[in-house]
A protein has these predicted regions:
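Acidic, glycine-rich A-domain
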Residues: 1-228
Length: 228
């Protein structure tokens, strides 16, 4: 029920937020209160009515970016996969294209990034020290029917590791930016702050969280993409 409500809520949000347009000076419809003073001044003036125009639904694409970290193991990742499945089906019915992406790391303890840092005599402030894993479960142009089996891969044992959200968001942003749709929405499904022990052990404790906030702010200030 919760997932269906979420799908319906997103669907309503997509249909809302569109600029409303009205036809005025009609003989029937909603009473146009802005024209009442002229009727009061001269009772021979007829009442004026207005009607909302039917707007064509904006060409829209939605990206779902799903946290595939270890903290999502069990019920959370199952719910996320079901949620992505239902949203994809629901929005496809509204002619909205949906891309489903996932993000995690290849390793628990840094992998090749950490090995390289060790070989270079551990320079200070090294930045990210883990290898990223970005997954395309469903591209925007692929129908849900052809991609639905891919969502089960989220439940694969051993996939869920660390979460480096800022770079994942940038990756998703770059993918949606090149789309031709008029309206672009990026929805992040995550259970908390970014965490990667290998990176945070040699950088400031808020290093990844700060980068995520900077990324969100940059996207909001420099693009028309809506982040949910």
């Amino acid at each position: 029920d919760l997932i269906i409500k979420l799908a319906n809520k997103l669907q309503r949000q997509l249909l809302a937020k569109q600029n409303r347009s009205w036809e005025f000076d009609l003989e029937e419809g909603l009473l146009d209160s802005s024209k009442l003073p002229r009727v009061i001044i001269d009772p021979y003036n007829s009442l004026s009515f207005k009607k909302e125009k039917d707007l064509e639904f904006k060409d829209t694409v939605v990206t779902l970016l799903i946290d595939n970290s270890g903290s999502m193991r069990g019920r959370p990742i199952t719910i996320a996969a079901i949620c992505a499945d239902i949203l994809s089906r629901t929005l496809e019915r509204c002619s909205v294209k949906v891309e489903i992406l996932g993000f995690t790391t290849k390793n628990w303890k840094g992998g090749k990034s950490r090995e390289k840092w060790n070989l270079e005599n551990k320079p200070i402030n090294p930045g990210r020290l883990n290898d990223l894993r970005h997954i395309i479960y469903k591209s925007a142009d692929k129908p849900w029917r052809q991609s639905k089996k891919n969502l089960g891969l989220m439940l694969k044992e051993g996939l869920l590791k660390e979460n480096i959200d800022g770079e994942a968001l940038l990756w998703a942003f770059k993918r949606i930016s090149i789309r031709k749709e008029e309206r672009k929405i990026l929805m992040i499904i995550s259970d908390g702050a970014p965490v990667d022990d290998s990176t945070l052990s040699v950088n400031s404790g808020d290093y990844l969280e700060k980068h995520l906030k900077q990324t969100v702010n940059w996207i909001e200030e420099n693009s028309k993409i809506e982040i949910l």
